Amino acid sequence: MKTYSAKPSEIEKKWWVIDAKNIVLGRLASRVANMLRGKHKPSFTPHLDCGDNIIIINAAHVKLTGKKANTKDGKIYYRHTGFPGGIKNTTAGKILAGKHPERVIKMAVKRMITRNALGAKQMSNLYVYANSDHPHVGQEPVIYDFASQNPKNKSNYL
């Protein structure tokens, strides 16, 4: 028996929509990263973009467990301006309460995808929106019920 390797013409991409309201961030990000890579398909081929297109809505209502959501001493994100002494930091709580709360999900998924040209192509298949409106109705996305797969996925106790 030979090892199966998919050809680019054989790849079929589906559109999924995931509601992130009250969903734990890390569990959501790891599942979305696997779906973007295509690891949930039996025709997975590591060197091809065989993943699906993912739409995440209600990104502003994603949950962080423990003290990570605190605005003062929660999870810290660092960036550097490129100038001496130019390290800047912000917390996950400030980003979620700020102007672009969808960046928390994008950063979490991006850090779980490989850092190369294929990873950049796979990240272009991720669409994250802060509220429940999205412009991808024409693609007829299928609703992916992430919360019902495991009771730990939905954060009821926070």
Curated annotation (Swiss-Prot):
Signal peptide: none annotated. GO terms for biological process: negative regulation of translation; translation. Keywords: Ribonucleoprotein, Ribosomal protein. The keyword Ribosomal protein applies. GO terms for cellular component: cytosolic large ribosomal subunit. Gene3D superfamilies: Ribosomal protein L13. Transmembrane segments: none annotated. One of its GO terms (molecular function) is structural constituent of ribosome. The keyword Ribosomal protein applies. Belongs to the universal ribosomal protein uL13 family. Part of the 50S ribosomal subunit. NCBIfam families: rplM_bact (TIGR01066). This protein is one of the early assembly proteins of the 50S ribosomal subunit, although it is not seen to bind rRNA by itself. It is important during the early stages of 50S assembly. PANTHER family: LARGE RIBOSOMAL SUBUNIT PROTEIN UL13M, RIBOSOMAL PROTEIN L13. This is Large ribosomal subunit protein uL13. It comes from Rickettsia canadensis (strain McKiel). The lineage of its organism: Bacteria, Pseudomonadati, Pseudomonadota, Alphaproteobacteria, Rickettsiales. The gene is rplM.
